[in-house]
Structure formats: C-alpha cells, structure tokens
Amino acid sequence: MNKWKVRRAPAGVQRQEDHREEYERDRARVIHSSAFRRLQAKTQILGVLEGDFHRTRLTHSMEVAQIGRGLVLNLQKKFPELNDLLPRLEQIETTGLAHDLGHPPFGHGGETALNCAMADYGGFEGNGQTLRILTLLESHSPENGLDLTRRTLLGVLKYPVPYANLCKTSSPDATDKSAKLNFQQTWQPPKCFLDTEQEVFNWIVAPLSNTDQLHFCEYTRPTTQSHG
C-alpha cells in the first residue's frame, strides 16, 4: 500500500469489507465525529451588520473545504501534467473540514485562557489539540482516535514543532499584576503540536528522509520574551 495511505491501527483492526477509497473514509470519519458537530457551537467571527447568524467554526470549516477543493480543481485544469502530485479532492476536503477541530470557544481568547490554566500540564494550543483529537480523543478506535491516513494527518499538521521547543524561556508569574493586565500577550501559546503527540508526529513524518525532516522542522529559537 502507498505509505501515505497507511493508518496507525493494525491492518487486522480495519474493516476489510469497506471498499471505499482511503481518503473517502477519512472524510466520512471526520464528518460523523463528535468533534466536527461541536464546531457549530463555536463562533468564528462576530460580523457587524451581517445579519442575525454569525459565522461559526463549522460553517468556516465547510468554506475552507470548498475553497481547497476549488483550488485543486483549478490546478488540475491549469497544470494537468502535475496531477499526480496534487492531493485527491476528498483528501483536501477532509483537511479543510478537520483543520479547526481543536480550537476552543471564544477564539484565541479561549485558547489563551486554556493555555494559562494548563501551564503546569504541558500548556494548550488549538492546532495541537486538533491533532490530539484526531489521533487519540475521538472514539472511532480505542487507541488511535479517528485513525486517519498519514497524508491527511500531515495536511492537518500546521506547525511541526513541539510546544516545549517553542515556548518562551521565562515563565509568567500568575500573581504579577502586569501579567494579568496583558493576559493575551502573556499567555498566548506558541504555534505548535503538543508534546504528548511527539510519537504521533514521528509516525507522520517517518516516510520523509532525515534531511527533509530537518528542513520541515526548522524553527526560530524562543527568547525570554517571545516564542519561537
């Protein structure tokens, strides 16, 4: 099997009678997941003078999936000689549908508050939580979450560096009044995956050469005042 279509669960655990294409199965698993349904209760943007219905994370994710599909169709028409390098339509749609699953209510303010609350337990970051939901927390499989294909997980993985490597080196003091006044700036997390998903990340990038992995994971080192 194509190394990018492999799943983490042993082959014996997977349904042998399911004849759908691998990325079609990924798409179905995301759409039927609890995490995807929860997006309807999370506001994406409070649009002024746009009517009574605000854009939610769910409608935003559907729009992202549609735009991604349109981009691939456009590239297929313009560069037919590169079609073998382009993602399948189902795969790019799945990436769009799943990309915000880990983001909490109240946008980046909610993310910052959770990072503060979880400071002693590895912190919190919405994109990292997305990977955790997809690979562990969702209930499709006992140990692998939705057990999506490697390529789909790579597409969802936005920031290929763990939290600990990027977090600024000075820890905020929760009793510091200035830290409370500048809460968003003080506790905003780095863009990363969570340290707990290091093993999952290693599996995702395993097909890449050592050189490609080094280039893929390059980052600016953090300072006492700013994240990497």
Predicted regions and their residues:
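A short small-residue
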Residues: 42-52
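Short, surface-exposed loop/turn segments at secondary-structure junctions
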Residues: 51-55, 80-83
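Aromatic-acidic/polar surface patches that form glycan- and anion
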Residues: 57, 61
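Sequence-structural signature of the catalytic-core scaffold of metal-dependent phosphohydrolases
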Residues: 1-19, 31-42, 62-94, 104-228
